Amino acid sequence: MKIIKYVLILTLVILIGGFLYFTNRTPVSPFKIEEFVKDSLRLEVNYSRPYKKNRLIFGSEADALVPYGEYWRLGADAATTFESNLDINFGGTKINSGKYRMYAVPNENSWKITLNSEPDKFGYFEPNYDKDVISIDVPSQPLLNSLEQFTISFEDNENGLSLIHI
């Protein structure tokens, strides 16, 4: 009877210790909220910021982390989400206010950016493409200097508001 009691106590200690470890550890790709507020408009992008770590991220090579023409969740861990409190014009098309899953299909000279109506799905798995709301093709440009960590930001300019992925 004492052995069963010790085994149960040991099992409980291991379970509690594991739970505390996994809930309190720093994620490898830190979570970020990028926000834009102007007048009554509020836009928000929630994503995780992976590091390059001397890896080939995009390319046609077999060892690229994200091969050209393949789904990418725009970050790491959970799906990247885009949220607007107002109806907006996104790439020339009106979209309703709300929260969307945002993902990309990178290519060498352009990226296809898509908003999907299932924002709460885990990002590793490809989305249900039937739930895509809008897809736009945007030109891509090589950076002059390599960046270590993925970044999404808003840029307000004379042409309107741009969402920049670096």
Set out the residue ranges of the language-model regions.
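Conserved small/polar residues in nucleotide/adenosyl-binding loops
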Residues: 165-166
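Surface-exposed, gly/pro-biased binding rims or lids
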Residues: 120-161
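Mid-length scaffold segments of soluble, non-membrane domains
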Residues: 74-121
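Aromatic-capped interface at the extracytoplasmic side
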Residues: 18-34
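Low-complexity, acidic/polar, glycine-enriched regions of mature
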Residues: 55-59, 64-86, 101-102, 125-127
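Short extracytoplasmic
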Residues: 38-64
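Charge-dense, helix-prone N-terminal extensions
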Residues: 26, 45, 89-90
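Hydrophobic membrane-insertion alpha-helices, especially the h-region
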Residues: 5-21
